[in-house]
Structures are given as C-alpha cells and as structure tokens.
Amino acid sequence: MNKFTYENTPLGKIASGYVEEVGAVEPRNTYNQKIAGGEYRQENDHGGHLIAHSLQGSSGLENIDPQNKNVNQIDQRHIEREVASYAQDSNNSVFYSVANYTPVGERPQATMINYSVTNKLTGEQINEYASFQNESHALQEQWSEEVYEN
C-alpha cells in the first residue's frame, strides 16, 4: 500500500509520497467530493484528489479540493495515468508530489505536479513538472486570445 503525507500550509495543500502500487484500496468518499471547497466551490467544480484515488490517495478532505472539471478529468488525469504506467514497472521507483496553491479552505488557483521516476536497474531518471490554472479550458483559451490581441 502506498503511503503519502498530507500537509496544510499558509499557501495551500501539499501531498507527496512514493507510488509503489496502482489501484484503489479504499472506497471513494463521494460526500467529501461533493462538499470540497464549501462556499468557494464553483458550479463546474469536482471534488478533485491531490493524489488520485487510483494511486491510493486518501478519500479524506486533506486530499480533496474543489477543482474545475476540465483540470480534474483531463489535465490532472493525464499525468496520473503517466505516473501509474511508470509505477506498474517494478524496476521503477516513482516519487509523486502535488501542491494546490491557495490559502487553505478556499478554491485553489493552481495545481502544481512534480514526479520523478528512477529505473532501479539502469539509474536512468525522468523528472517531470506540470502546472494548471484551476479554470475551464474555455476560459483559459479566452485569456490567451486576449493576450495575443493586445
């Protein structure tokens, strides 16, 4: 079973740990997913896990924040699937870290993900970083268009 640490900081939540197994080990807490963010939750938000349920992340509120559905189901899920594919190879050691930037208790403004894969046989290492604004793809495209118009 994977072990992750969860931390609340003045700038948001951080979760990290080694991914050694793939596959959920506890039932989803759909209630926590529905209440994540409270009054700050927006209409198109999901209760998104910092560490994915499929990577054995906790179903507790320490691991769930309101997250735009595009970010949750497309952007972050893409990275989670990459991490899972690396972790399924027993020759790999996979460290995974996710930070949601915002004061705790509010809707995150951004998600930052880092992961590192080390092949135990060859020593080869892969380091990846991604960050996402916690807004819909349509709104982000609009921002880009406004930047290029000016």
Predicted regions and their residues:
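Domain-level detector of nuclease and nuclease-like folds
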Residues: N2-N150
